[in-house]
């Protein structure tokens, strides 16, 4: 046999294939982590593809902001991003994370037929697989009517501070541990509803690494 090793790492495989390989004496391992770590470093061509996906996502985001108005449903607003992606040669969207008003907390709820009310905050996460199959994962929050009340302004400015602080930290050679130690500290009142991670990789989809909040 040309396969001298008895261990084989595969990223995607079905059950019957694993069984068949096992019968020949080959032990199958999950290659996901190996492949994800290899995908961390992007080629110049990949970076161009990622920028193209981001550009399309930003076009869609701007259209959503312009067309947001009281009386439309969350689904109607979300459809603008999907339409824009397809119009520009994009592929698909992983999910439909968009919510308004009280539905924004807890986070991660998908768009619905809820009617957006005047002055409500609207938050969404694109998770958009755009042109060339690369993902643009961008979160944004708008307010219907574009006039923030004091509570909305406080939360929004806190989010901006959070993102800017952590973005400035990132540099070549920094360990995950150092990043975690120097990262922006969530106020105690919001820690319980924190996101699953502070930062994560991106490429064909959400990718490794994923750096969690300190506990």
Language-model regions, residue ranges each:
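Active-site neighborhoods and metal-handling regions in enzymes and metal-associated proteins
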Residues: 1-215
């Amino acid at each position: 046999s040309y396969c001298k090793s008895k261990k084989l790492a595969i990223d995607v495989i079905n059950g019957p294939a694993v069984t068949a390989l096992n019968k020949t004496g080959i032990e199958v391992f999950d290659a996901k982590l190996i492949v994800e770590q290899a995908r961390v470093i992007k080629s110049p061509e990949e970076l161009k593809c990622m920028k193209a996906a981001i550009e399309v996502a930003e076009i869609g985001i701007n259209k959503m902001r312009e067309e947001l108005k009281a009386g439309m449903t969350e689904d109607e607003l979300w459809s603008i991003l999907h339409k824009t992606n397809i119009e520009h040669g994009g592929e698909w969207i992983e999910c439909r994370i968009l919510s308004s008003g009280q539905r924004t907390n807890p986070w991660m709820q998908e768009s619905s037929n809820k009617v957006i009310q005047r002055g409500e905050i609207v938050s969404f996460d694109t998770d958009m697989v755009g042109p060339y199959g690369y993902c643009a994962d961008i979160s944004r929050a708008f307010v219907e009517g574009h006039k923030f009340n004091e509570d909305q302004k406080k939360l929004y400015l806190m989010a901006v501070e959070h993102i800017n602080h952590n973005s400035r930290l990132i540099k070549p050679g920094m360990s995950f541990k150092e990043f975690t130690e120097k990262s922006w500290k969530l106020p105690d009142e919001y820690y319980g509803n924190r996101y699953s991670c502070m930062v994560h990789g991106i490429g064909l989809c959400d990718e490794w690494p994923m750096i969690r909040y300190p506990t």
